[in-house]
Design a protein with these regions (language model features):
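Alpha-helical transmembrane segments of multi-pass inner-membrane proteins
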Residues: 24-26, 75, 117-150, 157-188
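Transmembrane signal-anchor hairpin modules in multi-pass inner-membrane enzymes, especially those
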Residues: 1-89, 102, 106-124, 179-188
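Membrane-interface micro-motifs in multi-pass membrane enzymes
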Residues: 31-39, 90, 156-170
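Non-cytosolic membrane-interface motifs at loop->transmembrane helix junctions
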Residues: 86-93, 150-156
């Protein structure tokens, strides 16, 4: 599998390699914390501007247009906010997420599925590792590396003090089930 990943990695344009790796480890960033998530979003912004000519064609996509109008309404709401200084960073974060989505769309449309399948394989592996850890913690009261949740009735898994493993599983279950269903229907 390593040879396959290495061969496929060589077929990626140099300007896309860094964001491809970042996108591959995105689920881990959710486990590690906000700093890594923000670094990933920052790298998406850099990749967006490096590939602006390719990315700009997605501005005509209906979903992106809807997100853009949503963003504009949030900007207008900032002006009517009681505390605009406090509201503006939250609104700008929406723009960063929009750029992140455009970069993902650009990568998925630029490369063929066999290359992108590596991302889904790694995401599925991370998902199942965390899922196994959740069941381990439910059964034994601590996770596989010895962490215990602050609340005995809640599971934290690798997230430490943050009790967000349910949201993680809920979010990535959609990707995992979608990937496995696509793979089964296309006999990959």
């Amino acid at each position: 599998m390593i040879k396959f990943l290495n061969k496929n990695f060589r077929s990626i344009d140099n300007k896309d390699k860094f964001f491809f790796v970042i996108l591959t480890i995105f689920p881990l960033s959710l486990v590690i914390g906000n700093t890594i998530i923000n670094l990933i979003f920052f790298s998406a912004i850099i990749s967006f501007f490096i590939n602006f000519n390719d990315a700009s064609k997605y501005f005509k996509n209906e979903i992106i247009i809807i997100f853009f109008f949503f963003f504009l309404t949030l900007i207008i709401n900032v002006f009517f906010s009681i505390d605009p200084i406090n509201s503006l960073p939250r609104v700008l974060k929406i723009l960063v997420v929009l750029i992140f989505i455009i970069e993902i769309m650009r990568l998925f449309n630029k490369y063929d599925f066999s290359l992108l399948e590596n991302i889904f394989k790694i995401w599925t592996l991370i998902f199942f590792i965390i899922l196994i850890d959740v069941f381990f913690e439910l059964y034994f009261g601590f996770n596989t590396i010895g962490f215990k949740s602050n609340l005995p009735t809640r599971v934290a898994s690798f997230f430490g003090d943050e009790l967000v493993v349910g949201a993680f599983i809920h979010g990535f279950a959609l990707f995992t089930i979608g990937y496995l269903a696509f793979k089964k229907t296309n006999n990959l």
